[in-house]
Amino acid sequence: MLDPARLDNPAVIFDNGSGLCKVGISGEIEPRHVINSVVGHPKFNIPSARSNRKRYFVGEEAQCMYDGLYLHYPIERGLVTRWDDMEKLWKDLFEWELGVKPNEQPVFMTEPSLNPQETREKTTEIMFEKFNVPALYLCNHAVGALCASACITGLVLDSGDGVTCTVPVYEGYSLPHAITKLYVAGRDITEHLTRLLLAKGYTFPCILNKAVVDDIKEKLCTVSLGYKDTEKNCQQFLRKYTLPDGNTIQMSDHLCQVPEVLFTPDHLGIHDLGISKMVCNSIMNCDTDIQENLFAEIVLSGGTTMFPGLQDRLLKELEDLAFEGTPIKITASSDRCYSAWIGGSVMTSMTTFKQMWVTAEDFKEYGAFVVQRKCF
């Protein structure tokens, strides 16, 4: 039988992403640990400080030993595709990163918009059957991000490593019919930058290292105010970058061209709307009574929204797309790469949240389907 006192223990907050997993404890202002969402399986026996023969490695440990490992990424485009590896990742986060016993603390977990029913139920089964958690809650990633901005109604533009989406939220609930997704995000920008660098003749081996190109992207790339001005603007940002091997590359047109694919995915051969039109379309697909409220509370979330200039470019294009005189406000907090996690920390700290949990007794009585009834 469930010990009710366990629901009073601070919850473990998971924000699982295609590129990074963030984990920490309810009530704290930021995640305790942020690790790469990767699991490495040894090609041969590898000694480890944790055990004489470790069967798998996760996060940075896996990436540092990539030569001797088969690397698996359990989350692709926001969705779990390798459940065995996902379970290993969660186990490592519980036991080694946080050092907690999963059967003693409730678990709050973010999930992508339009998460398939079978994925939600599989997550529920693993948490209750494998980890024996006392309670669980699955929360839409965008709802968590909006909560971090102290809002319950607004439009969230979320862009991480694997997917970009626009999610209208009304009084704390996402509106699925108006959600739009674009499968262009941080990973695609990194790959695009890699191709551009190779095409320019920078064929140093470390250019093929994703972590190196990610660093170039995060330190040097910006968004121009308008694509027609890109070439002119790029000349103002000529900068050098020293690679880990000591070689130097000079960034020019790469600097502004790469994030442009968020606004014009046609450049990657993807014939979908860019983020400005996605925002506008999502709002226009909502009831007319709330459209003005959504335009007035647009919240950016995810690491791929961190490019300098993105907020200004988005505002400029939305002013052109929206009806004349429509008030538009875009919130872009400095910690928005963690906003969904922070929202989870805030929500689970509220005394009223206790009634929201799917408890172990709920799972025992109704099965995994109970998550469809209590988490929506």
Swiss-Prot record:
Entry's Gene Ontology BP terms: negative regulation of DNA-templated transcription; regulation of smoothened signaling pathway
One MF term in the entry's GO annotations: chromatin binding
GO annotation, cellular component aspect: acrosomal vesicle; cytoplasm; cytoskeleton; nucleus
Xref: SUPFAM superfamilies: Actin-like ATPase domain
Highest taxon in the source lineage: Eukaryota
UniProt-annotated location(s): Cytoplasm, Cytoskeleton; Cytoplasm; Nucleus; Cytoplasmic vesicle, Secretory vesicle, Acrosome
Stored Pfam families: Actin (PF00022)
Main location: cytoplasm
Keyword Nucleus: yes
Database matches in CDD domains: ASKHA_NBD_actin_Arp-T1-3
UniProt entry keywords in alphabetical sequence: Cytoplasm, Cytoplasmic vesicle, Cytoskeleton, Nucleus, Transcription, Transcription regulation
Membrane-spanning segments: none
Function: Negatively regulates the Hedgehog (SHH) signaling. Binds to the promoter of the SHH signaling mediator, GLI1, and inhibits its expression.
Family: Belongs to the actin family.
The protein, known as: Actin-related protein T1
Gene (name only): Actrt1
